[in-house]
From Swiss-Prot:
One of its GO terms (molecular function) is 4 iron, 4 sulfur cluster binding. The keyword Iron applies. It comes from Geobacillus kaustophilus (strain HTA426). This is Adenosine 5'-phosphosulfate reductase. Coiled coil: none annotated. Binds 1 [4Fe-4S] cluster per subunit. Catalyzes the formation of sulfite from adenosine 5'-phosphosulfate (APS) using thioredoxin as an electron donor. One of its GO terms (biological process) is hydrogen sulfide biosynthetic process.
Length: 235
């Protein structure tokens, strides 16, 4: 088994990127053979997440899908999760919540921490919960695409994740925005209606706005904060 500690010595698998799913199904088939129940998919239920869930369901219908439920998501996001649960009843969708409720966070750090220190808020409500999830597994799946942002352009199918001391599997690295939507329409998949309202990237409601730059899908995230990532994908 390819693990974090054995990364340097282990032989890394290679996958074709010129087939119908640009390698995604091949990567997922390998990942679930390699790790079985020791791999989880941390899903935001954005549009890439919907594609990955559908692909995963074809490989492992009872896979574990973890949603980092910060308590600050849009109602439309929770509606999307409900639709996904209905479409894929065999999937094990886990709503992972932070240790602190919003009221406890307010008492300890002050009101609306996301405005004053968004990095701290993301750490408390996303990074630490994901670290807790990954403590019990060897690898995790992410919907990162190289096209999404400059910080993601060098992502590989299989990555050594130093932040979480884990293996990070990214099946969609070669998919374009058009590829994602073509797949969703072709498969008639449910998706977050906010995507139709100018939100290509969707996170917590207080820190997400419609995209301001048509060439930057994440330009609506943490607008004016000098921040482009929640911290899950930064070493």
């Amino acid at each position: 088994m390819l693990t974090y500690d054995q990364w340097e010595k282990a032989e890394k698998p290679s996958f074709p990127s010129d087939n119908e799913t640009k390698g995604a199904l091949d990567v997922l088939a390998w990942a679930y053979r390699e790790y079985g129940d020791e791999i989880v998919y941390a899903c935001s239920f954005g549009i890439e997440g919907i594609v990955l869930i559908d692909l995963i369901s074809q490989v492992k219908p009872d896979a574990e899908i973890v949603f980092l439920d910060t308590g600050l998501h849009f109602p439309e996001t929770y509606d999307t999760i409900a639709k996904v649960k209905e479409k894929y009843p065999s999937l094990r969708i886990v709503m992972k919540q932070p240790r602190l409720t919003l009221e406890e966070q307010k008492a300890q750090f002050g009101d609306e921490l996301w405005k004053r220190d968004p990095n701290k808020c993301c750490e408390l409500r996303k990074v630490i919960p994901l670290r807790e999830v990954l403590t019990g597994v060897t690898a995790w799946i992410s919907g990162l695409r190289r096209e999404q942002s400059p910080t993601r352009r060098h992502v590989e199918y299989i990555n050594k994740d130093d932040k979480f001391r884990s293996i990070k599997v990214c099946p969609l690295i070669h998919w374009t925005w058009k590829d994602v939507w073509n797949y969703v329409y072709k498969r008639h998949l449910p998706y977050n209606v906010l995507h139709d309202r100018g939100y290509p990237s969707i996170g917590c409601a207080p820190c997400t706005a419609p995209a301001t730059d048509p060439n930057d899908l994440r330009s609506g995230r943490w607008a004016g904060q000098g921040k482009t990532e929640c911290g899950l994908h930064l070493a």
